[in-house]
Curated annotation (Swiss-Prot):
Keywords: DNA-directed RNA polymerase, Nucleotidyltransferase, Transcription, Transferase. It comes from the Bacteria. Transmembrane segments: none annotated. It catalyses: RNA(n) + a ribonucleoside 5'-triphosphate = RNA(n+1) + diphosphate. GO terms for cellular component: DNA-directed RNA polymerase complex. NCBIfam families: PRK00405.1, rpoB. This is DNA-directed RNA polymerase subunit beta. One of its GO terms (biological process) is DNA-templated transcription.
């Protein structure tokens, strides 16, 4: 036997074929959501209030400060919020202090700032009763970026951009004449020296001293028309504010507000970190030759003589001095925008290809502290210096698609940005109120208007592109949705503008973003998934773990470092499958490793790090595909995506051939019930599990409090699947923290179970599995193998109308007793009733307009004292295809104190449950992207059977394998068969699973034939088939695309208002479009009458279609068609363009077009007692 036994949770053992021992546990898979939101509550909110406070009025007399904040307790629990359609939120209270500087009076108050949505334990939000997920956004990090460009003459130039988090952009570029220009905030370009002069370096000499003498600078100075700081300031002002009279003061204040005002220009922590890193002097000194001697200013010791080449070792030696004081210069700008000195660090080196003739200045920004979030003159000088250095081949250009230059905005930051918008709107209101109200009687509460804050938060959760309705089809879909990374959304890319490069897999994605899991279609590459081991650091960069190699001994240690993409670029990383000795020494001399995206073979001394696990490359969903290494990546992509569409079955099975990820995925998804504290199980019911805690008191373990875990039973998920939890522990079990107490949907014994293990044969059968179709045995229908439960919710509300309130009642006009048999005395359907399409769910009547009474009605009214009620039937009925059994009914009444929308007095919700067996037309798939539609369900006796008489369950077409190159399914098939014979479950982790020899070994152990095939007998004749057939156990899942949801038919129904043609689509109960090409087909056959009928009475000849209906009802001949409505619309359109269009008959008389009144349909319909609906488009 190969492989070793591994325990997954309490109930499942698997034989694992993994050879590489895992050094690191998988992190909590939804940590990206929970930790980000926690940061927001702890620090993000505080930062916001500090940024905005104090708010002062225009005179500086009143000052409003935000001191502290606290979140209260939510009003309802998560379950109650879902039931009542409210938001799961807690009240936010802020302590505010108002200081009157004239009188010295101080007022403090607690101000309520609205209800703030809270995150549930599983990383979701409940907004208006629906669970939503905030997807993390991938955006360009604020920083300074340099890129090379080649013009049409083949000349190499450069562009650079300083991108802040918010504020004006600075762009540098060269032109064909080697002049360096700057653009401020996307305006027309200026020579870069104009900006330098405006900063206070007014003369040519100062600029040359700063940047060093070079031809690019002299070209730029020639182009520059200004010669002093004042002129430069005026020049810039004219560019930024054309048409306004320029003054030096205005120009200064404009530049200050654009770049040096923290309220208008913000780099954020991450921008400051990136700029300091990029513009630090050490990066440009590496491997360069010094053109000056470096001396320690304190001791006078020579650190590096002129002409020294600064290799890694020398640079590391002088780095502490570089950080401290070497090359520090203080530039003194005169009369520039910013008063005060500019700290710089400048060192001269020889230009790389000048053989020591030309020296260039390298200016760094002297590492500005992290507190300064705006750009400084030092940054601008250093960024210009870097640009000139690039022209002499010193420094690197940046790759914008590198994950070192893209960062994640998770929930916390997205919320913070939204909250900032609300607060800044509120700030304006506060300022205005300060100047209007009486200063003595004023209070903080009277100043603060919380409306804009609440509105901006509501808007974010309700309508932001990144706030999405949670995909709850199954636990894997839930988990993946929370780990999704989107490049779309506000401040991100748009589908149309995103090019090929942004979407492509990049080497820096390794271990950070999954190269496989992404949608097919227009969003490919823009929506990604976080890799299994990845984490997000404080700056929002994705990090991946690596095992450190000790540089002294060369041994791989157990210590794990998380590296960002740009840190990883400095190291050589070995793969996880390198052979190691007991102590961690590399056994091979030559090692395959990665360095900056290149695969290299190098000696073991050069290795700095090693991968922690083979599956760190892929996401959670992709890691659930066994034998992923044997599948083509296009098919693996489909496999990963289709697992998320698996419908939860009534009795699911976890896969016989799994990957070991099933347990972790299920546990972290939030669908299972997890034990919070260790203890012993005291009671187990369908709806509840009681755990008595163990508490440690003076070294003794004693019984403590009782924890009661509630199960969710038969709840409708967001996608209409059934969400049901069932306990898997027994009374007396000792449970530990983090253990699974109850399975959720699509789980078995604590493991993910999306489908069932079925017996599959690769063979054709009368052509029924042509083009990926699937032939299935009737046993799978009879034994409810692929039966799923679907729950739909229908609601009806009784409102106040102008003519009086609507009423929910059993007394409905023109409805017989038979139709009311399942309604209770209130007029609401009873629980457990079986309903079909069109049945009543809630009886409701709406008052009609009061008409003039006839003599008879007046007489009746006089006798019985009440007018016959003028109401019309507006009851809720079961829509087409919605029949089933009533699972539950919920009634909310305004009188009982339930919160209802304005104008609604009563709300009734009915839940209908359907049990759907698998049928022809349903879509099924394996885990390797092998999908198909069921074409035929055969009786069990007609299915081919094995020599022992067992009929197979499913037949797949063997032609689906070779061209698709997903051989993983064949290996799974054989290994699954062997495992079923042996009665074991298997774990074959991705990239470290069962090899070919392991599979053959297990096949032999199971006593199967040595070609792993078998003879099959035809169930119809009993004859054996000509060739041996591959038969085995494959894990097949039923997908959410079910034929019941797609089948649709209509005779009459709603029509579009303008064209009077039937609406389209199942949701609108529309018709089938008979389009242009279908018309050609009938024309080609010369079927004139059929065609005329289709274009008139079956579509938009309004009078004709009612008459036709009448003729059919009365059994008469169908009348002559009239003029279609769309023809009238066309004529009206032409008339509206000013043309005089008339319709003439054959004998040259004008045909009068009668404008159809809205009532036409209804008048004719009333005569016939037919229902006709007209709907607005």
């Amino acid at each position: 036997m190969t492989g070793q036994l591994v325990q997954y949770g309490r109930h499942r053992q698997r034989r694992s074929y993994a050879r590489i021992s895992e050094v690191l546990e998988l992190p909590n898979l939804i940590e990206i959501q929970t930790s980000s939101y926690q940061w927001f509550l702890d620090e993000g909110l505080r930062e916001m209030f500090q940024d905005i406070s104090p708010i002062e009025d225009f005179t500086g007399n009143l000052s409003l400060e935000f001191i502290d904040y606290s979140l209260g307790e939510p009003k309802y629990s998560v379950e109650e919020c879902k039931e009542r359609d409210v938001t799961y939120a807690a009240p936010l209270r802020v302590k505010v202090r108002l200081i009157n500087k004239e009188t010295g009076e101080v007022k403090e108050q607690d101000v309520f700032m609205g209800d703030f949505p809270l995150m549930t334990e599983t990383g979701t939000f409940v907004i208006n009763g629906a669970e939503r997920v905030i997807v993390s956004q991938l955006v360009r990090s604020p920083s300074v970026y340099y890129s090379g460009k080649v013009d049409k003459n083949g000349k190499r130039g450069f562009t650079a951009t300083v991108i802040p988090n918010r504020g004006a952009w600075l762009e540098y570029e060269t032109d064909a004449k080697d002049v360096v220009y700057v653009r401020i905030d996307r305006t027309r370009k200026l020579p870069v020296t104009v900006l330098l002069r405006a900063l206070g370096f007014g003369s040519d000499q100062e600029i040359t001293e700063l940047l060093g003498d070079n031809e690019y600078l002299s070209n730029t100075l020639e182009k520059d028309n200004t010669d002093s700081t004042e002129k430069a300031l005026l020049e810039i002002y004219e560019r930024l504010r054309p048409g306004e009279p320029p003054t030096v003061e205005n120009a200064k204040s404009l530049l200050v507000s654009r770049f040096f005002d923290p309220k208008r220009y913000d780099l954020a922590n991450v921008g400051r970190y990136k700029i300091n890193k990029k513009l630090h002097i050490k990066n440009r000194l590496f491997n360069q030759r010094l053109a000056e001697t470096l001396v320690d200013p304190e001791t006078g010791e020579i650190l590096a003589a002129e002409g020294t080449v600064l290799d890694r070792r020398t640079l590391d030696r002088i780095l502490p001095y570089l950080e401290k004081n070497i090359g520090f210069k203080t530039a003194k700008p005169m009369g520039g925008v910013v008063a005060g000195d500019v700290e710089l660090q400048s060192i001269k080196i020889y230009a790389p290809e000048s053989e020591g003739e030309r020296s260039i200045n390298v200016i760094g920004n002297a590492n500005i502290t992290r507190d300064i979030k705006h750009i400084t003159p030092g940054d601008i000088l250093a960024s210009i210096s870097y640009f000139f250095n690039l022209l002499y081949k010193v420094g690197d250009t940046d790759d914008i698609d590198h994950l070192g230059n893209r960062r994640l905005r998770s929930v916390g930051e997205l919320l913070q940005n939204q909250f900032r918008i609300g607060l800044s709107r509120m700030e304006r209101v506060v300022r205005e109120r300060m100047s209007i109200q009486d200063t003595n009687a004023i209070t903080p509460q009277a100043l603060i208007n919380i409306r804009p804050v609440i509105a901006s938060i509501k808007e974010f959760f309700g309508s932001s592109q990144l706030s999405q309705f949670m995909d709850q089809t199954n636990p894997l879909a839930e988990l993946t949705h929370k780990r999704r990374l989107s490049a779309l959304g506000p401040g991100g890319l748009t589908r149309e503008r995103a090019g090929f490069e942004v979407r492509d897999v990049h080497y820096s994605h390794y271990g950070r973003m999954c190269p496989i899991e992404t949608p097919e279609g227009p969003n490919i590459g823009l929506i990604n998934s976080l890799s299994s081991f990845a984490k997000v650091n404080e700056f929002g960069f994705i990090e991946t773990p690596y095992r450190r190699v000790d540089p002294e001994t060369g041994l791989v240690t157990g210590q794990v470092d998380y590296l960002t993409a740009d840190e990883e670029d400095n190291y050589v990383v070995a793969q996880a499958n390198m052979k190691l000795s007991e102590v961690g020494e590399f056994l091979d001399e030559d090692i395959v490793a990665r360095f900056r995206g290149e695969n290299i073979v190098t000696n073991k001394e050069r290795i700095d790090y090693m991968d922690v696990s083979p599956k760190q490359v892929v996401s959670a969903a992709t890691a659930c595909i066994p034998f992923l290494e044997n599948d083509d990546s296009n098919r693996a992509l489909m496999g990963a995506n289709m697992q998320r569409q698996a419908v939860p079955l009534i009795n699911p099975e976890s896969p016989i051939v799994g990957t070991g990820m099933e347990y972790v995925s299920a546990k972290d998804s939030g669908a299972a019930v997890i034990c919070k504290q260790p203890g012993v199980v005291e009671r187990v019911e369908a709806r509840e599990v009681w755990v008595r805690r163990y508490v440690d008191v003076d070294g003794q373990t004693v019984k403590g409090d009782l924890d009661r875990y509630k199960m969710q039973k038969f709840i409708r998920s967001n996608q209409g699947t059934c969400y049901n939890q069932r306990p898997i522990v027994s009374v007396g079990d000792q449970v530990v923290k983090g253990e699974i107490l109850a399975d959720g949907p699509s789980m078995e014994l604590g493991e993910l179970a999306l489908g069932r293990n079925v017996l599959v044969g690769f063979m054709t059968w009368d052509g029924y599995n042509y083009e990926d179709a699937i032939i299935m045995s009737e046993r799978l229908v009879k034994d409810d193998v692929y039966t799923s439960i679907h729950i739909e919710e229908y609601e009806s509300e009784a409102r106040d109308t102008k003519l009086g309130p609507e009423e929910i009642t059993r007394d409905i006009p023109n409805v017989g007793e038979d139709a009311l048999r399942n309604l209770d005395e209130r007029g609401i359907i009873r629980v457990g009733a079986e309903v079909k399409d069109g049945d009543l769910l809630v009886g409701k009547v709406t008052p009609k307009g009061v008409t003039e009474l006839t003599a008879e009605e007046r007489l009746l009214h006089a006798i019985f004292g009440e007018k016959a009620r003028e109401v019309r039937d507006t009851s809720l009925r079961v829509p087409h295809g919605g029949g089933g059994i009533i699972l539950d009914v919920k009634v909310f009444n305004r009188e009982d104190g339930d919160e209802l929308p304005p104008g609604v007095n009563q709300l009734v919700r009915a839940y209908i449950v359907q049990k759907r067996k698998i049928s022809e037309g349903d879509k099924m798939a394996g885990r390797h992207g092998n999908k198909g539609v069921i074409s035929r369900i055969l009786p069990e006796e007609d299915m081919p059977y094995l020599p022992d008489g067992t009929p197979i369950d499913i037949m797949l077409n063997p032609l689906g394998v070779p061209s698709r190159m997903n051989i993983g399914q064949v290996l799974e098939l054989h290994l699954g068969m062997a495992a079923r014979y042996l009665g074991i479950h298997i774990a074959t982790p991705v990239f470290d699973g069962a090899r070919e020899e392991d599979v053959w070994g297990t096949i032999e152990e199971a006593g199967m034939a040595n070609d792993a095939k078998t003879i099959l007998y035809d169930g119809r004749t009993g004859e054996p088939f000509d060739n041996r057939v591959s038969v085995g156990v494959m894990y097949m899942i039923k997908l959410a695309h079910m034929v019941d949801d797609k089948l649709h038919a209509r005779s009459t129904g709603p029509y579009s208002l303008v064209t009077q043609q039937p609406l389209g689509g199942k949701a609108q109960f529309g018709g089938q479009r008979f389009g242009e090409m279908e018309v050609w087909a009938l024309e080609a056959y010369g079927a004139a009458y059929t065609l005329q009928e289709i274009l008139t009475v079956k579509s938009d000849d309004v009078i004709g279609r009612v008459k036709t209906y009448e003729a059919i009802v009365k059994g008469e001949n169908v009348p002559e068609p009239g003029v279609p409505e769309s023809f009238k619309v066309l004529i009206k359109e032409l008339q509206s363009l000013g043309m005089d269009v008339k319709m003439m008959s054959i004998n040259d008389t004008e045909i009068e077009m009668r404008d159809t009144e809205d009532d036409d349909d209804h008048q004719s319909a009333d005569k016939l007692n037919v229902e006709v609906e007209t709907t607005k488009e």
